[in-house]
Amino acid sequence: MNTMTYSVDATAILNELVQRSITQLCHFTTFGNVRSIFKMGALYSRQTLEELRVPADFQDPLRCDGARYINLSIHEVNFRLLSKFAYDQPYAEWCILRLRKEICMRTGVRFTTDNAAAGQVRQYGTAEGVFGLKALFAASVPAKAGCVTRKANKPMNLPTSPQAEVLCPEPIALRDVMDVMVVNWEAKQRLVNKYGIPEALVKVGERCFPSMLRCRSYEGAVMD
């Protein structure tokens, strides 16, 4: 495993995060996946999990360039993307890993103004360093549908496009996980008692989730 190093402009990146009141990065996943994350002691890319034959529900795209990144969002999850996966997997329970913002300061971290699997990203590429981070908050950014214009009332800690991502080279250690958010108290009990996640790390935050997950019932559902 490579020793973690920091970007040459790590200080500038941290200053930008602080000035924008960005307190966390987010990564949504299923209860089954988060159990594997805690067993392995880190988050790994889809490529590595497939090579190790670790059972997982994959949300991150399989990158054709061979790069091993973990897809993260800034300050809150991508509601649209989480809703899509939740619709496609109606019996899966979802949680959100809230990660330390300092991950953005690491060497090799890249920033993209749109979802990493989108054609616009392949066309316009990604960027590293404070330049790449600032680009996420531009007045107008390229996106799948053309361009996304920043709304006047957009909170300063949210990127112009909700599809923006932070691509972090694997692994992300458990020490960078601040907490694990779930949609309600019952979900917390299941994640702690059935999946073995430490209770002190699991927090309830209904507003962190899209509306379709706030009202979903898992009573009688078949889960792993």
Where are these regions (language model features)?
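Active-site-proximal loop/hinge segments that shape catalytic or ion-binding/gating pockets
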Residues: N2-N71, N78-D224
